[in-house]
Amino acid sequence: IGKAANTVTNSPSSITLNTSARTATFTVNRKGNGTITATSNNTSVAKIKSINQSTGVVTVESVNDTTGTAKITVKVAEGTNYKAASDTTVSVTAQFVTIYGVEWDWTSGGSTRGKRTDAAASFGDPSPAVNNGSGSSPFDGKMPWSGMVKETRAGGVEVKEPKYWFKWTKTGKKLKLQIADGPVAGFSVDPVNRDRGDGLGELDYSYIGRYHCASGYKSATGAAQQVNITRSQARSGIHNLGANFWQMDFAQFWYVNMLFLVEFADWNGERIGRGCSTSNSKMNNGQTDAMGYHTGTTAASRDSYGFTQYRNIEGWWDNVYDWMDGCYYNNNGLNVISNPNNFSDSANGTLVGTPSSGYPSDFTIPTA
């Protein structure tokens, strides 16, 4: 008498790993006593911890809390009374990181507004403060946004910049930006906290001044801003505060702006307010100190000129012009300098693109 055919099913056919369940199980339902083996096709995400040959229970465990997917292939060998069974699979989803995104579709237009994606898909619009009042945002309590808190340090009042991971994707006329609160395959560490070749390595957080630099090049409230200076003067003056103090640069610019883009799903900064001095002349730092929320305008209306702040950074656009380091133009186009030790007005940069005239209508994603 020959051996009978075997039929195998797995219950459940998909499992999830996360911070609440770093291991998960499924049961292999088979006929007879054929030996069960199981292998993962992505051992950087999930691996087999154990197999109980009596009960058919397979235990799968996370690998270093890595977010991603894997497929477990189950094999049942020939047993005493049954033939070897056909392979079956179980899907594994490991979610230890939250991803927030926004996508713009410029196929038939050029709107500044985008559509929220990923974990932000169901979020409503933030409500920044008006007239120094209160405000709210669905991103409050979500890292890295919630980590942008004020601290008094050697450079004055500064705002903490926690590390995040990001990814730009371009498909035809669609542009997508995603920000994650942990490492994800295919994502990059933010421009400020990544290893910039300056000897500090990858950082967990950095800082940016809450205010424009005042006397002594520090970030101080109630003080007048440094104006009518060159970029190189600002560079040296700020760097004199300490070995790791640098003028706001191209990396800082994009660190903050990417957070804004995902939070507001809009390229229009005036969603917060019109940033401009109310008197057509500069006014001292600290105009937003009385604001009851980290983001908003001092004006009675968002359509009126006042003083603005975003995530505790005052004057991201208003009152005075800013120098930005770490970039320069030459005949070839825009050059970017990653290592702050190499900041220069005309050298040491990597060419990232050639701008065209007029307002931007599309973007490319540089690979440099």
Per-region residue spans from a language model:
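Enriched for extracellular/lumenal, surface-exposed ectodomains of secreted and cell-surface proteins
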Residues: V74-A85
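Short aromatic-cysteine micro-motif
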Residues: R153-G155, D181-W316
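Solvent-exposed, low-complexity, repeat-rich "mucin-like" stalks and linkers
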Residues: I1-S40, T93-F96
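Low-complexity "stalk/linker" and mucin-like segments enriched in Ser/Thr/Pro/Ala/Gly
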Residues: N41-V58
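GGW-centered surface loops in extracellular recognition modules
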Residues: F96-K160, F166-W168, F245
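Short, conserved beta-strand/loop elements in beta-sheet-dominated catalytic cores
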Residues: K163-W165, A243-M248, Q252-W254, M291-A368
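Extracellular/luminal low-complexity segments enriched in Ser/Thr/Pro
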Residues: T55-G68
